[in-house]
């Protein structure tokens, strides 16, 4: 969405990004390993899983412990999502692949080179998940915050803001309503 919003094709008047993957949390060593493994993508092994999915060919989705999840602090919504996946297993993502990691790091590295203060031409709301373990909240704010057209709402949330507790979601929706009505 961020790529589209700053492109010449953009027809949106405003944009809301919710814990966007403008950046990812990865240290220098991890980035080097992914770059090296990314060579496997070039020879046809891009679909090789880097993360073992919680999937069993006979039993389907295997429930992960709530305490280990990096997406939400809301147990009820976490468990509801698992029940939904059990009913509709085809909608689940079965692990991160070499190809996905390679291209995610490549794209987020490109985002670091963009002059966001020039690229953003219309109002944008960044819903920032301060407790995010997947994207780099600080870097997202640093990059997108270059523009005066960006409004940043930081929330004490993990990655899936709209799957968080009612209190966090209410705060997010209030920011969205204010942004869209301004």
Model-found features: residue ranges?
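Alpha/beta-hydrolase-fold enzymes
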Residues: 4-91
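Hydrophobic/aromatic beta-strand patches that form the interior of the parallel beta-sheet core
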Residues: 16, 125-127, 153
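Active-site nucleophile elbow and catalytic-triad environment of alpha/beta-hydrolase enzymes
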Residues: 95-116
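Short beta-strand/loop motif that positions the catalytic acidic residue
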Residues: 120, 126-128, 132
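Conserved alpha/beta-hydrolase "acid-adjacent" motif
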Residues: 133-139
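Catalytic histidine neighborhood in serine/cysteine hydrolases
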Residues: 141, 145-160
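Catalytic histidine-centered segment of alpha/beta-hydrolase-like enzymes
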Residues: 157-171
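C-terminal alpha-helix
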Residues: 175-182
């Amino acid at each position: 969405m961020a790529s589209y919003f700053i492109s010449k094709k953009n027809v949106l008047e405003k944009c809301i990004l919710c814990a966007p993957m403008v950046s990812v949390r990865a240290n220098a060593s991890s980035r080097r390993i992914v770059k090296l493994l990314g060579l496997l993508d070039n020879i046809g092994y891009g679909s090789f899983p880097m993360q073992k999915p919680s999937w069993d060919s006979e039993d389907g989705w295997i429930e992960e412990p709530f305490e280990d999840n990096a997406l939400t602090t809301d147990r009820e919504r976490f468990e509801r999502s698992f029940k939904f996946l059990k009913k509709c297993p085809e909608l689940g993502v079965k692990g991160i692949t070499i190809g996905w990691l390679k291209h995610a790091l490549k794209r987020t590295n490109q985002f670091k080179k963009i002059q966001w203060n020039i690229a953003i031409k219309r109002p944008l709301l960044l819903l920032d998940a301060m407790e995010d373990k997947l994207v780099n909240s600080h870097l997202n704010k640093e990059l997108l915050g270059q523009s005066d057209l960006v409004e940043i709402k930081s929330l004490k949330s993990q990655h899936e803001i709209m799957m968080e507790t009612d209190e966090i979601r209410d705060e997010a929706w209030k920011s969205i309503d204010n942004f869209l009505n301004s």
